[in-house]
């Protein structure tokens, strides 16, 4: 029996979302170029989603898209668009409009629940440049080093017991309580639930040192402290 020519499967990918706060193409181009120069291994020729929630219908989307594409970034979709006229322009440009969905309202349950067992994925070998490790629905522990150009991703926490030179993305499914633990933090990028620092944004006293990174849920920004 011959195999069908196509097969549809669900999957998930880690994409950077560029939030536009200015509609001037030259301003956006310059800002993106600076970001790419800061982290070329992470952003050069990268697929990105553009969030246009802060833009209005008067935005010249064609020129804006050209400015973004001229940096080498590949726009795979647009999110945050609520203006019908802008939606039409974006659709005519051949780009899909993505829905991020509504955040679920948290309900405090008075009845104590039995805590579920926490799963952990353990990697005992070095993670080389170009490799990507994803711990789906669990924490990730790497007992060796993570090279520049490598990527470690987890829906939960990430623990690196070696030199961390690559990219670490924790809580990629939206878990804002996830944390990143490194014995030697020299990462190209660290991210928790979509909030990230590039290497030059990591506070200098912690670079190359044992550190613990989490997300301050009051103001939704990353914070860092020594790893005891």
Curated annotation (Swiss-Prot):
Q: Its domain of life?
A: Bacteria
GO biological processes:
cell morphogenesis; division septum assembly; regulation of cell division; regulation of cell septum assembly
Q: Which Pfam families match?
A: MinC_C (PF03775), MinC_N (PF05209)
Keyword set for this entry? Cell cycle, Cell division, Septation
Q: Which InterPro entries match?
A: CAP/MinC_C (IPR016098), MinC (IPR013033), MinC_C_sf (IPR036145), MinC_N (IPR007874), Septum_form_inhib_MinC_C (IPR005526)
List the coiled-coil residues.
none
Membership in a protein family: Belongs to the MinC family.
Provide the function of this protein: Cell division inhibitor that blocks the formation of polar Z ring septums. Rapidly oscillates between the poles of the cell to destabilize FtsZ filaments that have formed before they mature into polar Z rings. Prevents FtsZ polymerization.
Question: Which HAMAP family does the record associate with it?
Answer: MinC
Q: Which NCBIfam families match?
A: minC
Describe the subunit structure. Answer: Interacts with MinD and FtsZ.
What is the protein name given in its UniProt record?
Probable septum site-determining protein MinC
Q: Tell me the organism's taxonomic lineage.
A: Bacteria, Pseudomonadati, Pseudomonadota, Gammaproteobacteria, Enterobacterales
């Amino acid at each position: 029996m011959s195999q069908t020519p196509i097969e549809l499967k669900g999957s998930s990918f880690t994409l950077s979302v560029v939030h536009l706060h200015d509609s001037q193409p030259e301003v956006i181009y310059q800002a993106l170029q600076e970001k790419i120069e800061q982290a070329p291994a992470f952003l050069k020729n990268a697929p990105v989603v553009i969030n246009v929630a802060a833009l209005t219908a008067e935005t010249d989307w064609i020129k804006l898209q050209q400015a973004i594409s001229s940096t080498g970034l590949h726009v795979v979709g647009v999110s945050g668009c609520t203006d019908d006229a802008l939606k039409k322009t974006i659709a005519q440009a051949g780009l899909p409009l993505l829905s991020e969905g509504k955040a679920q309202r948290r309900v405090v349950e008075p009845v104590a629940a039995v805590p579920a067992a926490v799963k952990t994925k353990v990697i005992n070998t070095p993670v080389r440049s170009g490799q990507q490790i994803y711990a789906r629905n669990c924490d990730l522990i790497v007992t060796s080093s993570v090279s520049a150009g490598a990527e470690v991703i987890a829906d939960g926490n990430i623990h690196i017991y070696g030199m961390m030179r690559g990219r670490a993305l924790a809580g990629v499914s939206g878990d804002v309580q996830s944390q990143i633990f490194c014995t030697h933090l020299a990462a190209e990028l660290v991210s928790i639930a979509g909030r990230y620092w590039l290497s030059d944004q990591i506070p200098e006293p912690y670079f190359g040192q044992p550190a613990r990174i989490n997300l301050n849920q009051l103001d939704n920004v990353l914070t860092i402290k020594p790893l005891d």
